[in-house]
Amino acid sequence: MGIEFNHLYVTLDSETLESIGQSEFISQEFCTISRDTVKTDTESWTGIYLRGKHSYLELFPPGGAEGLRESFSGLGFNSQQAGQIDIVKEKLRSLLGSKEILSDLQVRQTEDGKVPWFHYLSINPAEREAFASWLMEFHQDYLKYKNIKLTSDGCFDRAAYLKSLDTSETCLFDDVSEVHLELTLSEQEELALLLQSFGYESSCEGDITTYHSHSFMIKVCQKVAPRYRIRKVVCTLKEQLQQEKTFTFGKNAQLNVGNSLAIWEFG
């Protein structure tokens, strides 16, 4: 099934967030960076966006969205073709038992009024959780509004979507290939069910469970009380760098860049 990783978010302390936002390397070489406020018909959020060719990172301050506290984080996925979200929904229903599925249409507030943005699906949380994961299926009205073209075989194109947001074509950041998580037992169980409904395969080695599909991988280590859920993010680069560099941002973020990878560490 054509389910892709789309983006992730991490909630950072203000000092760390501002250090990233003021970095010349981040803004001039690594990625397209912007401070944005997004409004829907039910909520709004404000954060720093680090955009690459195929995926992006949302970095929030505490309270950047309602209920967010430092270290709260999440992973967002997208379907490639219309109707795939319904297939996932049926698979989830057969896996979940008594757990509820949360699904709805997100409507975006734009300069031209309200535009249907994407359908989303997740395992229903009782309240804002420290870790979230969800699936999006972008609405045809929004793709038309932003003039985002599908591929020749009718698939959603992450690069075309990000290009519509004025993402630089010369920045280093290409895609996210790996995310390393520390999750509680219940958080891992819910993520595993969602990934299973996407068609991900899994394997275990020691205390690490790996979930993978195509060129994307998630590694999970189970913890009783993890401080940060997203601990490491491996990004692919468009070109190989000969000189390795390390950048430290505040107390809770570090970026190691070298060869064809950039590795973020949080917490």
Locate predicted features.
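Terminal, regulation- and interaction-focused segments at domain boundaries
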Residues: 1-18, 172-183
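Extracellular structured ligand-interaction cores
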Residues: 5-7, 45-47, 72-74, 176-178, ...
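Helix N-cap motif at beta-to-alpha junctions
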Residues: 16, 80-84, 184-188, 237-241
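Amphipathic alpha-helical segments
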Residues: 18-33, 88-94, 185-202
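Glycine/small-residue-rich interface belts in oligomeric ring/scaffold proteins
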Residues: 32-73
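Long, folded non-catalytic interaction modules
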Residues: 65-78, 224-229, 241
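Long, charged/polar, surface-exposed segments that mediate recognition or autoinhibition
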Residues: 74-93
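Vicinal oxygen chelate
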Residues: 90-175, 186, 198-267
